[in-house]
Amino acid sequence: MASPDAEMAAFGEAAPYLRKSEKERIEAQNKPFDAKSSVFVVHPKESFVKGTIQSKEGGKVTVKTEGGETLTVKEDQVFSMNPPKYDKIEDMAMMTHLHEPAVLYNLKERYAAWMIYTYSGLFCVTVNPYKWLPVYNPEVVLAYRGKKRQEAPPHIFSISDNAYQFMLTDRENQSILITGESGAGKTVNTKRVIQYFATIAASGEKKKEEQSGKMQGTLEDQIISANPLLEAFGNAKTVRNDNSSRFGKFIRIHFGATGKLASADIETYLLEKSRVTFQLPAERSYHIFYQIMSNKKPELIDMLLITTNPYDYHYVSQGEITVPSIDDQEELMATDSAIDILGFSADEKTAIYKLTGAVMHYGNLKFKQKQREEQAEPDGTEVADKAAYLMGLNSAELLKALCYPRVKVGNEFVTKGQTVSQVHNSVGALAKAVYEKMFLWMVIRINQQLDTKQPRQYFIGVLDIAGFEIFDFNSFEQLCINFTNEKLQQFFNHHMFVLEQEEYKKEGIEWEFIDFGMDLAACIELIEKPMGIFSILEEECMFPKATDTSFKNKLYDQHLGKSNNFQKPKPAKGKAEAHFSLVHYAGTVDYNISGWLEKNKDPLNETVIGLYQKSSVKTLALLFATYGGEAEGGGGKKGGKKKGSSFQTVSALFRENLNKLMANLRSTHPHFVRCIIPNETKTPGAMEHELVLHQLRCNGVLEGIRICRKGFPSRVLYADFKQRYRVLNASAIPEGQFMDSKKASEKLLGSIDVDHTQYRFGHTKVFFKAGLLGLLEEMRDDKLAEIITRTQARCRGFLMRVEYRRMVERRESIFCIQYNVRSFMNVKHWPWMKLFFKIKPLLKSAESEKEMANMKEEFEKTKEELAKSEAKRKELEEKMVVLLQEKNDLQLQVQAEADSLADAEERCDQLIKTKIQLEAKIKEVTERAEDEEEINAELTAKKRKLEDECSELKKDIDDLELTLAKVEKEKHATENKVKNLTEEMAVLDETIAKLTKEKKALQEAHQQTLDDLQVEEDKVNTLTKAKTKLEQQVDDLEGSLEQEKKLRMDLERAKRKLEGDLKLAHDSIMDLENDKQQLDEKLKKKDFEISQIQSKIEDEQALGMQLQKKIKELQARIEELEEEIEAERTSRAKAEKHRADLSRELEEISERLEEAGGATAAQIEMNKKREAEFQKMRRDLEEATLQHEATAAALRKKHADSTAELGEQIDNLQRVKQKLEKEKSELKMEIDDLASNMESVSKAKANLEKMCRTLEDQLSEIKTKEEQNQRMINDLNTQRARLQTETGEYSRQAEEKDALISQLSRGKQGFTQQIEELKRHLEEEIKAKNALAHALQSARHDCELLREQYEEEQEAKGELQRALSKANSEVAQWRTKYETDAIQRTEELEEAKKKLAQRLQDAEEHVEAVNAKCASLEKTKQRLQNEVEDLMVDVERSNAACAALDKKQKNFDKILAEWKQKYEETQTELEASQKESRSLSTELFKMKNAYEESLDHLETLKRENKNLQQEIADLTEQIAEGGKAVHELEKVKKHVEQEKSELQASLEEAEASLEHEEGKILRLQLELNQIKSEIDRKIAEKDEEIDQLKRNHLRIVESMQSTLDAEIRSRNEALRLKKKMEGDLNEMEIQLSHANRMAAEAQKNLRNTQGTLKDTQIHLDDALRTQEDLKEQVAMVERRANLLQAEVEELRGALEQTERSRKVAEQELLDATERVQLLHTQNTSLINTKKKLETDIVQIQSEMEDTIQEARNAEEKAKKAITDAAMMAEELKKEQDTSAHLERMKKNMDQTVKDLHVRLDEAEQLALKGGKKQLQKLEARVRELEGEVDSEQKRSAEAVKGVRKYERRVKELTYQCEEDRKNILRLQDLVDKLQMKVKSYKRQAEEAEELSNVNLSKFRKIQHELEEAEERADIAESQVNKLRVKSREIHGKKIEEEE
C-alpha cells in the first residue's frame, strides 16, 4: 500500500497547499499537550487567544495567554482546546470540541500554511489567499477526478467531482451553492467549477459553423467565454474587491446520458444598476466603460464619439478610474473575443458598444431652468445629438420627451412640465434601465448560444450570490440580499439536518424529529407573508400619496410589538438613521427606508420609452419592445411572463425570481461552499479574528455547529470502534472467542467510566455527543502510553539479552580461532609439512589440464549448437513478430468490438432505465399536473369570486355614500330588494330540494364510487389544501374588513367634523347675505355706468379671443419660419460646403494646369468653360445667399412686429386672465369643499347600506336553513315512528345474537394457540432482524414507501377484523346452506385448494425471482459501498426469512385446521367470552405490533412485489374461511371475531338505551336497521359469489376479495353516516333555534326599518310640497315680473339695450357677492371705469338737452296736449299707485322668500336630523346584528370544527370524495346565483342612485329658478325706481312749464 505522501505526489506542486505531509502529522501528534489546562479564552481585542489555565476560584478562571498576559474570566468564557492531532484538520465536524475558537484557529492555522480549503460537515469553507497558488493546475484537476470526498484533500474540485459523480450514479440533478461577502472569492471559485466540468466532461465536438462565418468555438470554450463578457458588464471595483460581481447568477450546466457536456444556461439576480450612475469615492463603475476608453481599439472611440479620458463623463468618474490589478486593454480584447465566440452578430456587437457609449453620454446631458418658470429646458444639444445618434433616435424628439413627457390622464394624454431635478432623475433612470435590459438581453443571447439542442439528461447548477450584508447604512438592496440568504440558510438547515436526523432514524436511534428549517421561519414570514414588509411596501406603492413616513407607520402598526423579529432601532451617534431592525439568523440589521417606494416602483419616462421602441437600432427597440406588457425575468430565462396592464414592482419581481431559484434548488442535491474574506487590507496570510467570526456567523457555519451539537455529530462504525478502542478494556472482549462488533462495542462502552447518556447505539454505528469522542481519545492515549511504556521496557530487556548471547558467542569463536592459529604456528616448520605444501598444488594442476581439454571440446560443440539455435531463434522471432502483430490487431478489433458492445449495452440499459424513469415521471407529472390544473382552476374561480366580491364591495361603498346623503329616497329600493329576496328565497328552496334529491341519488350511486377510492383520496388532499388556502384568504379578507370598519369610524368622525364646519359655513353665508344686501344698495348707484362698460368689456374679450387665436397662429407661423430658417441654414451650409469643395477643386485643377504647361487649345477652352460654370455657380450661390439673408431679415422684422403687437395684446389680456383665474380658483375651492362633504356623507351611507345587505343575505340564508331543518325534522319523525315498530323484532334478534355470542367463547383455545404460534414466529422474525439490518440500510428509501403501503394494509386488516362480527350472522345463516351443499362443494373446494396451492407455488417462484432481483440491486448499491460480501449474507438471510414465511404459512394451515374442529364449540359461554374477547383484543394488538416490526424487515422484498404481497395477504385471509376454502375460512374467522365485539357493543348500547332514554333507543334501532340492510345485501352478494365460484374459481377469489372490501367500506360508511346524521341533527336543532331567534329579530328589524322609511317618506313628501309651493310662488313672481318688464318696455323702449347690459351686470354682481374678498380690488377698477362713465354722462346730458329743445318746440302744441297731459297725469298716478303696490308686493315677496329659505333650511335640518336619527338607529341595530353575527360565527366555528373532524374521517375512506366534488360544483352554482343576486342588488342600487340624482337635480333646478326669480325681482324693483325718478322729473318739468 502506497504511503500518503506517495498518494499526494499525483497533485504535483499543489500537494503542500492541500494536505500536511506525513512527517508534519507525526510531529503534530507528538507535541506535548495537556488537555485539562490548554484552552481558548475570550480576549477583548483578538476575540479568542490560546492560553493555559493557572487556577480556578469561585466560578472565575485565571488563564495565562501565549502572549504572556494573565486574564481572569468567567468559566463560560473558557473553551477547551482540541488535541494536537486535530491541528489543521480537514473536516472541522470531526473535532472533539466544536466551538467558535476551535473553528477560527483551525482555519487560521490552515490559512497560515496556505491550505485555503477546509470542510465543516456539509460545508466547504474557502479563505481568499490574495495571491496565486498552484492549486488549480491541470494535474490537480486530473488528480481529483473520480476521487471520493474522504480520499482527497478539501478542494472546490472535490466538491465539483462529487457533484458530478452523484449526478451520474444517483441520476439526480445537483447544485453547488457558493456564498460569501464581496471579495471573498465567489466568482473565482465559480470559474474553477466551470473549468473543472469543462475539462472532465468535455464533449470535444466543434459546433457547426454558421453561414456568417463568424468565430465559433466548442461548447466548453463558449461556457468559459461567458465569464469574461458577464464580468465586463456585471463586475466592478469595490472597496473590498477589485473584481466584485455586482449580480448573482445561477449557472446550469447540462449533461447528456453519458456524462458529456450537452448545453448550459445562466440566470441572473439583483444586478446593481444604481452603480451605472453613482459610485462611492473608492469604487468605480462597471469594467466595460473603462475597457472601451483604454484605446486598445481606437475604432470604438470614433464609433462611440467619446474620448479616452474617463473624467470627461460624469457617470463613470465619480470614484476611481483605474485599478492596478486589472489591465483594461487586455480585458477589452478578452471581452471582444468572448462576444465573437458566443455568436453575437456584427450588428448586435455594434449595438452593445453603442448603447454602452450612449449611457456615458447620458451622464453629460445638461438642463437649465427657464426664466421666471420652474420648467427645465436643454442647455445645449451637442451631447444629446451624440446620444441620440448612438441610440438611433431624433435628438429634438429625445429632448422634448425628457423635458415635456406625455402623461396619460384618464383616456387622454397630457403634456407635463418637468423641473431640472426631475429631468436629471428621469435621465438617470433611463440610463440604468437601458444598461440593465441590455445586460439581461445579453444573458438571454448567451443562453440561446449555449443551447446546443443536444439531448439533456441532468444538470449541475452553480449558484454565485452575495452573502449576508450588515453595513452601517442598510437599504432596500441589503434587505433583498439578506432575505435571499435567509431562505438559503433555511434550505441548508433543512437539508443538512434532515439528512442528519434521517440517519438517526435509519440507525434506529431514539430521536425526536426537529425541523431546524423552522428556526428561520419567523423572520422569513415577517418579510414575505401577507401583511409582511414586502406586502406593505407593495401596497404603499399602489397609493399615489404614499410616503416613506406612511410606509414606516404601517410597518410599526402591523409588526412593532407583535413580532419578536421586528424591532425599533436605538439611535446611535455617528451612524446613519435607521427606521426599523430585523433579527436575522446572522444578527440584527438596522434598515433605512428612505426612497424605498421609488426604488420599488422604478418609474420610467414612458414618452422616451416610446422613442426607444421606434429606434433605428434594432437591439434597443427589441429591449423595450414589450415594456409595460411583460415582467422581466431574472437573467437567462427565455422569454418573460405576461402581467397584463398592471405594473410589477421590484420586490414582487425579486420574490418571483427567488421562488423560482428555491424551487430549482429544492429539486437538486445541494453542495455548499462558503467563501471567507480574511482581512480588509487584502494582505496575503493575515487573518482578522472578528471579521472572520462575523462571516462565519453570516454564512451559517457557526449556526451549523450550534445545531450539530444538539445531535450526535461524532459517529464510528462498530468494527472501527472495536478495533480502535479495544485497548481501553481488553478483558471486555475475550481473545479467541468470536463476538459481534456491535455487542463488543456495547460491552466495551459499558465497562468504561464515561457518561452513558452521551452516546447511542445504531444498527451499524455508535453515535457520540460532541466532546465524548475526544474524552475516549484521551483515555486511549493514556492507555497507549502505559502499554507502550511496558512494551518498551520488555523490548529493551529482550534486546539486551540478545546482545548478551551474541557477545558470548563471539567470545567462544575468538577462543577457537586463537587455538587453531597457535597450533598452525607450531607445525608450519615441520619438514613433512613443507613437503605437503609443495606437492598438493601439483596434483591439482595435472587434473586441471585434463579438465581444460575436455572443456575445449565441449566448447566447440556448444558453439556450433549455439549458431544453429541462433539461426532458428531469428526465424522464430521473425515469425513471432508477425504473429504478435496479427494478435495485437485481432485484440484491438476484439477490444473495439467489446467496447462498442459494452457501450451499446450500457446505453441500452441506460435508455431502458431512463425510459422507465421518464415514463414514471411523466405519469407522476401528468397526474400532478392534472391535480394542479384542477386546483388552479378552483383557485382561479375562487380568486375571481373574491376579486368580484372586492370590486362589488368597493362599488357598494360608493353606492352607500350616495344613499346616506339622501336617506329619504330608499323606500322604493328597499321594497324592491325585499321582493327580490323573497323570490330568491323561493329559488333557493327549489335549489335545496334539488340538492336533496341529488344527495339521495349520490347515496344510491355510492357503491359505484368505492373502486375510485385511492384516486379520490388524493383529490381530497388537494381540495383540503385548497380549502386551507381559501381559509387563509378569508382570514385576510376579514382583516381587510376590520380595516374597513376602522376607516368607517374615521369617516364618521370626519363627517361630524364636516357637519360642524357646514353649520359655521351657513352662519358665514348669512353674514355674507347681509353684506350682500348692503353692497347691493351701494352698487345700484353704479349699475347704469357698469351696464355701459360691460358691453365694452365683452367686445374687448371677443377681441382678446381673436388676438389669442392670432397669437397661436403667429406662433405656429413663427415655428414654421424657424424651421424654414433652419432648413435655409442647413442648405446654406451645404451650399457653402459645396462652394468650398468647388473652389478647392478649381484650385487643384488650376495647379494641374500650371503643372501641365503645354496644354492644348481644347483643354484651355474646357478650362475656360469650367471657370465660367464655376463663376456662374458662385453668382448663383451668392444670389441665393443674399436672397436667404433678405428672406431671413424680412422674417425677423415681421416676427419682431408681430411679437410687439402680440405683446401689447397679451398684456391687455393678461389682466383679464388673472381676474378670471382668481374667480376660477375660488370656485374650485368651494367645489372641493362641497365634494369632500358629499364624499364623507356618501361613504357613511355606503357602509350602512352594505351592512343592510349583509343582514338581508344572512336572513335569507337562515330562512333556507330553517326550512331545510324543518324537512329533516319531519323525516326524522317518520323514521322514529318506523323504528319504534321494529324495536320488538330487533329485540328478538338481539336475544338470538346473545345465544350466538355465547357460542363464540369456545374459540378461545384456538385463538390462544394461534397467538402462541404467532409469538413463536415473532421470535424467529426477531432473530432474522439483525441479519436483515444491512439490507434494510441500503434499501431505506424503498422501505419508507413500502412501510406506508404496509400501514395501509394494516389498516385494511384492522377493518377486516372489525368486519368479523358481521360475518358471524352470515355464518349462522349460511350454516344450513353449507350442511345441504357440503357434499357438492367438497370437490369444488378441493379444486379451489389445488388452484390456491398452485398459485402459492407460483407466488413462491415469483418471490424467488424478486429475491434474485433484490439481490442484484443490493449488489449494485453495496458495490458502491464496498460491502459485496455483507450483501450476499443478507440475501441468504432474506431467503431464510422467506422460508420462515413459508413455514409460518404452513403453521397457519394447521391453526385453521384446528379452527375447523373447534368452531362448533365456540357457540357457548357468553359471559366468559366477553372478558376473554377483551383480553384477546389486547393480545392481538400486541401481536399486530410485533408482526409489524417483523414485517418492517421484509419490506425490501416487497418493493418489486406489491401485487405478490397482496396475493399472499389475500391467501392468508382466505385460509380463515370455514367451508369454501382456506382463504375464506380466515376471512370468516376475522369477520366472526369482529362481529362478536361489535355485536357486544351493540347489545350494550341496546341495553343502555332500553334502561335510560328513548333517544338512545332510536340511535340503536337506526344502527341495527343499517346493519340488517348491510347483512341482507352481503348475503345476496355472497350467493352471487358462490355462483361465480362454480364457473371460475380464480375469478371467485378476486371478486370475493373486492366484495369483502366493498362490504367493509360500506359498513364503515354506514357507521359514519349514522354519526354524521346524529351530529347534523344536533347542529340543525341548534341552528333551528338560532334561526328562529334570528328570523324573529330580523322581522322586528324589518318592521322598524319600514317604520323609519315611512317617517322618511313623510319628510320627503313635506319637502316636495314645500318645493311645489316655492314653484308656484316663483311662477307668480315671474308673471308679475314679466308684466312689469312689459310695462317698462312700453314706457321706455329705448332702455332695451340697457336692459341687456343690466342682465350681464347682474350676473357679474352675483359673482361679486360670491367673492366678497375681491371687492376691494374691483372697486379700484370701478373708479377708473367711473371716469370713463362721466364722459358718457356728459354725452347723455347733451342728448337730454336736445330732448328739452324738442319739448320747447312742442309748446305750440301744448294746448292740444293739455287733455293728453291730464290723461297722462292720471295714468302716471295710476302707475305710481301700481308702483307702490308692486313695492309692497316686492317686500312681501322678499319676506316670503326669506320665510321659504328658513323653511327650506328647517326642512333640510329636519331631514338631516331624521337621517341622523335613522343613522344612529341603524348603527345601533348594526352593532346588535354584528354581535349576533359574532355569536353566530362562534357557533358556526364550532360547527366548522365538527365538519373538519368529519372531513378528516371521510378522507380515510370513499364517500366524501365524490360528495365534496359534487358539493364544490353545487357551491359553484350557488356562487353564480349569488353573483347574479349581487348584480341585481347592484342594479337596484344604481336605480336608487339615479332616482336620488334626479330628485337632487330637480331640487337644484328649483333652487336655481328661485335665485333667478330673486334676480328678476331685484331687476324689476330697480326698473321701477328708475321709472319713478324719471316720472318725477317729467312731472316736475311739466309743472314748471305750466307755471
From Swiss-Prot:
It is found in: Cytoplasm, Myofibril. Residues 842-1939 form a coiled coil. Keywords: Acetylation, Actin-binding, ATP-binding, Calmodulin-binding, Coiled coil, Cytoplasm, Methylation, Motor protein, Muscle protein, Myosin, Nucleotide-binding, Phosphoprotein, Thick filament. The keyword Iron does not apply. One of its GO terms (molecular function) is actin filament binding. GO terms for biological process: muscle contraction. Residues 784-813 form the IQ domain. Residues 87-781 form the Myosin motor domain. The modification N6-methyllysine is found at residue 36. It comes from the Eukaryota. The modification Pros-methylhistidine is found at residue 756. Residues 34-83 form the Myosin N-terminal SH3-like domain. The keyword DNA damage does not apply. Residues 658-680, 760-774 are annotated as: Actin-binding. The modification N-acetylalanine is found at residue 2. ATP binds at residues 180-187. SMART domains: IQ, MYSc. Residues 839-841 are annotated as: Hinge. Muscle contraction. Myosin is a protein that binds to F-actin and has ATPase activity that is activated by F-actin. The rodlike tail sequence is highly repetitive, showing cycles of a 28-residue repeat pattern composed of 4 heptapeptides, characteristic for alpha-helical coiled coils. Limited proteolysis of myosin heavy chain produces 1 light meromyosin (LMM) and 1 heavy meromyosin (HMM). HMM can be further cleaved into 2 globular subfragments (S1) and 1 rod-shaped subfragment (S2). Belongs to the TRAFAC class myosin-kinesin ATPase superfamily. Myosin family. This is Myosin heavy chain, skeletal muscle, adult. It comes from Gallus gallus (Chicken). The lineage of its organism: Eukaryota, Metazoa, Chordata, Craniata, Vertebrata.
